[in-house]
Amino acid sequence: MTEVTPMVFVVDDDEHVRSALARLIRLSGYSVQTFESAETFIERFDPNGGPACLLLDLQLPGLSGLALQHQLHEWLPIIFMSGHGNMSSAVDAMKGGATDFLPKPVTDSVLLDAIERALERARRLFGWRSELQDIQSRVKQLTPREREVMTLVVAGYLNKQVASELGAAEKTIKIHRARVMEKMKAGSLAELVRLAEKAESATATDTTASYR
């Protein structure tokens, strides 16, 4: 499997700052994309892309850095930078899940350390989301009856109890159960339970995600 190159997004309304940051980030071996506003970033951001972090200016024309953070929710790690930051803004940013809040000007070493921490978190998030997407694709292969069987099986029902609940022959339930195990790529009941729980978690995440 080809490793996905992490991306560093930079949102800052100062063109000189964007250029300087992009140059530093590229020279340090990272991929980088820059944006002059939060609105431009939202238009182009793909939440289903590879692992990435966001280097975000607090004070922006139009949508502010904190407002953008609120819209992105848990989609990617955010490093705030500000020359006008105050304690209240820093607290709000960290409560919102920011990985760092850096005052401008920031030294190269401090910034790059913050980027690496954020990207490490991004890699974990990407791996987690990739796993959930794989599990969801398995669930989609199940027929409606197989999903019913899986729901009851992971709830602890025996085959004869599932048969009684669904009004089917126990032999038929055994066939459905075997197909569920095969399609979900589960080697044991315990693994099927784990997969079902993650599939449910993925559905809940999709339902509550704040990014649009």
What are these regions (language model features)?
Residues 86-89, 102-115, 161, 165:
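C-terminal output helix
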Residues 4-17, 21-25, 38, 54, ...:
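Conserved acidic segment of CheY-like receiver
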Residues 158-191:
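Recognition helix of helix-turn-helix DNA-binding domains
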Residues 36-37, 61-70, 85:
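Acidic catalytic/metal-coordinating carboxylates
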Residues 181-212:
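Basic, Lys/Arg-enriched C-terminal extension of HTH/homeodomain DNA-binding domains
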Residues 2, 34-53:
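Acidic, metal-coordinating helix/loop segments flanking the phosphotransfer/catalytic sites
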Residues 57, 82:
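Active-site residues of response regulator receiver
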